[in-house]
């Protein structure tokens, strides 16, 4: 077993991520559809987060490797995707988070991304976990839809034994029968007991996997309800995807917040986060 322990507060420049601190936003778009659209979305997030004083990290994927159909849009790929993300990082002076799907991608992605993300479906893949951990980048570990919150401790231990203690856990829903996900609110406390920052991916928790003929469906209309519920548990951060025209988004449009609603949505969550974290803790054991 590793002598390392996870960092309770994960630091990224001036950004501090911890369950007792003001929430951090991992926000952007699902997949890099085009360079122009990525810049448009990044600019909107950056401007709004500056106004609301929300610490911010831009998120987008360069490849969606688990699409329902062979013909579904996947993104620009590793080389071009890293290039675009690097340009966004430099232009807006904003940190970057993106996901890694295969071990060989970990090192080149970590040269640009400040946080590398372990996809939920791949979270038990030991070779991938080890390759990501060895980059020494911050790792955002998505909780698999088929794993309990407590089982995430095994993945944390893999990272620690590979020498990386800069770890984040991220809830994104649990499979509930066919074509449905639910969020166990008690699971947030279970993961927080592991002394790591815990985030909530409200976007993908709204999925109805396989809910359409050749793609996932979603429940955008319930995003405010679910986001409020999750953030009321007192979390380190929120993971969110938005799009100027979700009906035309090339991936997970039914789950994406309308970009025009981003500011009022985040303003409500900032107010709720401050309220919850201002409460005196009660020991109900």
Swiss-Prot record:
Q: Which domain of life is it from?
A: Bacteria
Chief place where the protein resides: cytoplasm
Q: Which organism is it from?
A: Acinetobacter baylyi (strain ATCC 33305 / BD413 / ADP1)
InterPro entries linked:
Aldolase_TIM, DAHP1/KDSA, KDO8P_synthase
Top EC class per UniProt?
transferase
Q: Which GO terms describe its biological process?
A: keto-3-deoxy-D-manno-octulosonic acid biosynthetic process
NCBIfam families attached to this UniProt entry: KDO8P_synth, PRK05198.1
E.C. numbers: 2.5.1.55
State the protein's name: 2-dehydro-3-deoxyphosphooctonate aldolase
Localization terms from the record: Cytoplasm
Q: Which UniProt keywords apply?
A: Cytoplasm, Lipopolysaccharide biosynthesis, Transferase
Assigned protein family: Belongs to the KdsA family.
Catalyses which reaction? D-arabinose 5-phosphate + phosphoenolpyruvate + H2O = 3-deoxy-alpha-D-manno-2-octulosonate-8-phosphate + phosphate
One GO CC annotation: cytoplasm
Its pathway, per UniProt, is:
Carbohydrate biosynthesis; 3-deoxy-D-manno-octulosonate biosynthesis; 3-deoxy-D-manno-octulosonate from D-ribulose 5-phosphate: step 2/3; Bacterial outer membrane biogenesis; lipopolysaccharide biosynthesis
Which gene carries the instructions for this protein?
kdsA
Q: Which HAMAP family match?
A: KDO8P_synth (MF_00056)
Listed PANTHER family: PHOSPHO-2-DEHYDRO-3-DEOXYHEPTONATE ALDOLASE (PTHR21057)
Gene3D superfamilies attached here?
Aldolase class I
Q: Which GO terms describe its molecular function?
A: 3-deoxy-8-phosphooctulonate synthase activity
One matching Pfam family is DAHP_synth_1
């Amino acid at each position: 077993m590793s002598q390392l322990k996870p960092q309770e507060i994960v630091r990224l420049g001036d950004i501090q991520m911890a369950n007792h601190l003001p929430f951090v936003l991992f926000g952007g778009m699902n997949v890099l559809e085009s360079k122009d659209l990525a810049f448009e979305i990044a600019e909107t997030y950056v401007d709004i987060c500056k106004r609301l004083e929300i610490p911010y990290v831009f998120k987008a994927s360069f490849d969606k490797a688990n699409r329902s159909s062979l013909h579904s849009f996947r993104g620009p790929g590793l080389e071009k995707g890293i290039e675009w993300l690097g340009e966004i990082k430099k232009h807006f002076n904003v940190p970057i988070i993106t996901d890694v799907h295969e071990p060989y991608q970990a090192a080149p992605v970590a040269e640009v991304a400040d946080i590398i993300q372990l996809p939920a479906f791949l979270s038990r893949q030991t070779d991938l976990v080890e390759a990501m951990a060895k980059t020494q980048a911050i790792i955002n570990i998505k909780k698999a839809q088929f794993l309990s919150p407590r089982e995430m401790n095994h993945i944390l231990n893999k990272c620690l034994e590979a020498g990386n203690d800069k770890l984040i856990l991220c809830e994104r829903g649990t499979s509930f029968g066919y074509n449905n996900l639910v969020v166990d609110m008690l699971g947030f406390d279970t993961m927080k007991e592991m002394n790591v920052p815990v985030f909530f991916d409200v976007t993908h928790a709204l999925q109805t996997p396989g809910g359409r003929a050749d793609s996932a469906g979603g429940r955008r209309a319930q995003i405010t309800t679910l986001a409020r519920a999750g953030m009321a548990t007192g979390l380190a951060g929120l993971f969110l995807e938005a799009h100027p025209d979700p009906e035309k988004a090339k991936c997970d449009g039914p789950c994406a917040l309308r970009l025009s609603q981003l500011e009022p949505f985040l303003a409500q969550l900032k107010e709720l986060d401050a309220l919850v974290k201002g409460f005196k803790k009660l020991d109900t054991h």
